[in-house]
Each structure stands twice: as structure tokens, then as C-alpha cells.
Amino acid sequence: MYYSIIISLIEVVLVLVPALLGIAYVTIAERKTMASMQRRLGPNFVGYYGLLQAFADALKLLLKEYVAPTQANIILFFLGPVITLIFSLLGYAVIPYGPSLAINDFSLGIYYILAVSSLATYGILLAGWSANSKYAFLGSLRSTAQLISYELVLSSAILLVIMLTGSLNLSVNIESQRAIWNIFPLLPVFIIFFIGSVAETNRAPFDLAEAESELVSGFMTEHAAVVFVFFFLAEYGSIVLMCILTSILFLGGYLSINSLDVFNFFYSILFNIGFIDLNFFNIFYYFYKEIFVNNSIIEGLIYGLTIGLKSSILIFLFIWVRASFPRIRFDQLMAFCWTVLLPLLFALIVLLPCILYSYNILPVNVL
């Protein structure tokens, strides 16, 4: 009993520590990328090329004096950011970083991620209401309305993916893309899902919950020092999680190009032009297969690097969108969800099963 608990704790640490480190470096990447787009240098003093800037900022916030409003509900004021951070990190428990490389790869993984991401709304609502501030309360209401609305967009887009794969299990969704990634037959759905992900994570141009010109800093206006770090980590943790989920649903997750196929392709070219002989190929092929293909450690690293690379590209798109587009009005944001995205998704939900059924490729467990 105790042994299994210790193993579970080790698994949680092995997943969350790299995730938190990745979140820290996403903040640095965002600042450096936006600086490059705006012809600035960005952070470049703390550490080599500014690589330790996030840790310096975290230390600064941890050492700051914590101040709370006198009329605030102190317990809920502290509890709101903690709840938001916990639910933003719970989604990492079902992410498969490779075959059988997940804390708990159970059959309802997609449903679980949608559930815990929607529960983070309670933390934002508690934080805004308990601060006893008009700006914080209005920001929390805006954020709640936005998250609930775009949760429908994400759920509807995921439903279209499930129609192709026939499962709510993340690993099954990845393995079903060995022939072709879902982004190719479902490109419009991918675009809608990406837009919904940007809105779901309160990122520009959909960051209406913390619009500086209207709400000072939204639901986190009164929070400072350590509890502000919780909100900060929760926001960027949600960004990384949504990018990983997008790469799993549409970009094949940890699946990469078969290295043996690439090897055979280049060998056939070199052999046909007489650059190498057959004996050299057999020796090199044997060592290559033993070191890179049959080695479970190397294979696991390749899986992790693959899903990390795909997620990094999507994170860059998040940053690119933030640096390129102006903030829209809140009524435009909600109208775009309810009058454009959702009707379009409902039309696709009706159209896609008809196409799949007419070609007899609808998964059996969806019928």
C-alpha cells in the first residue's frame, strides 16, 4: 500500500516539476519573442541571454510584502488563486508523453481535461468576489462568462474529433493518427479549436477579463506577491496544457516520422548512386537499430521531444497572435462565439457523420 503511494507521488513529481519549469521558460520565450517582434532586446541581464529572468521575477514576488484589502474575505481571497492553480495543473495527470507514459491514462481523458479546466472558473469567481472591489468582481464575471461560452466551442470541436477516432482516451486518439494527422481532414475544426483555446486561456486578443484600460487588471487587481504568482502560473499552465491537448488531438501527439523509413529512404538514394556498398549498410543498419530503435530510453526521449516540439510551435502561435492583433470588445467576443463559431460547429457536427457514414468509415462505437 505505502509502496504504491510512494510510486504515485514520484510520478506526480516527475510530471509536475518539468511542467512548472516549462511554464517558467514559456514566460521567457514570450518576452523574448515579443521583444524581437517589436525590435527590442527583452530580458537579457539575469543569466545567459536572460534565461534565468523568470526565476528572478518569482523570487522578487515571493519576497514582496503581501497586502490584502481591509474589507476582503481573507480566506476566499487566498483560496481563489490556489483553486485556479490546482485545477490548471490537474490536467497534466492524463497527458500521454509516450505509449503508457502518463500518470493515469484512463478511458475518459478528454472528458477529464474539459471538466477540470471548467472547474478553474470557481477559483476566478471566488478571487474576484472576495476582493470586495468593483474592478476585480467585474473582471471575474467577464472571465466566467467567457470561459463557459468558449468551453462549448472546445467541447463541440472535440466531438468532431471523437467522431473520427471513436474514443475519449488520449492515447487512442494519438494512435489513430498513425496514417494521417487529424489536422488534414479537420483543418477548419483545428482553426476553430485554436481560436477557442486562445479565448479559453484569457489570452490576447481575447483578454477582456483583465483589460487594463477598463478593469485595471481584472480579477487579479487586488492580488499581489505570492498569490499573484499562483494566478500567473495558472494562466501559463493552462496555455501549455491547451497546446499539448491541441497537438494530441490534431498533430499526432508523440507520433513522429518513422526513423527507419527515413533511414531506408536516404540509403536507397546513396546506394543507387554508388556512394555506399551493401556490407557497410548492413553494419550501420544493425548499430542504428540497436541504439536508436530498440533502446527504450532513446525511444522515450524521442516521444517526449516530438510532443514538446509540436506544443512549442503552438505556443509560438499563441505569442504571435498576442503580438499581432488588437484587443476586441467584450460584446464582439461573445457575439463571435454564439453567432459564428457555435453555428459553424453545429453545421459540421451534422455534416461530418453524413460523410463518414456514406463512405462507411464511421467508427463502430460511435454508431
Swiss-Prot record:
Localization per Swiss-Prot or TrEMBL: Mitochondrion inner membrane
One GO molecular-function entry: NADH dehydrogenase (ubiquinone) activity
Keyword vocabulary terms for this entry: Electron transport, Membrane, Mitochondrion, Mitochondrion inner membrane, NAD, Respiratory chain, Translocase, Transmembrane, Transmembrane helix, Transport, Ubiquinone
GO biological process: aerobic respiration
InterPro entries linked to this entry: NADH_UbQ_OxRdtase_su1/FPO, NADH_UbQ_OxRdtase_su1_CS
Family per similarity comment: Belongs to the complex I subunit 1 family.
Reaction equation(s) it catalyzes: a ubiquinone + NADH + 5 H(+)(in) = a ubiquinol + NAD(+) + 4 H(+)(out)
Full protein name: NADH-ubiquinone oxidoreductase chain 1
Topology term for the membrane: Multi-pass membrane protein
Gene Ontology cellular-component annotations: mitochondrial inner membrane
Pfam families documented for this protein: NADHdh (PF00146)
Role this protein plays: Core subunit of the mitochondrial membrane respiratory chain NADH dehydrogenase (Complex I) that is believed to belong to the minimal assembly required for catalysis. Complex I functions in the transfer of electrons from NADH to the respiratory chain. The immediate electron acceptor for the enzyme is believed to be ubiquinone.
Organism: Podospora anserina (strain S / ATCC MYA-4624 / DSM 980 / FGSC 10383)
HAMAP family assigned to the protein according to its UniProt record, in alphabetical order: NDH1_NuoH (MF_01350)
EC number(s) given by UniProt: 7.1.1.2
Membrane-spanning segments: 5-25, 43-63, 74-94, 108-128, 152-172, 179-199, 225-245, 265-285, 301-321, 336-356
PROSITE patterns (UniProt xref): COMPLEX1_ND1_1, COMPLEX1_ND1_2
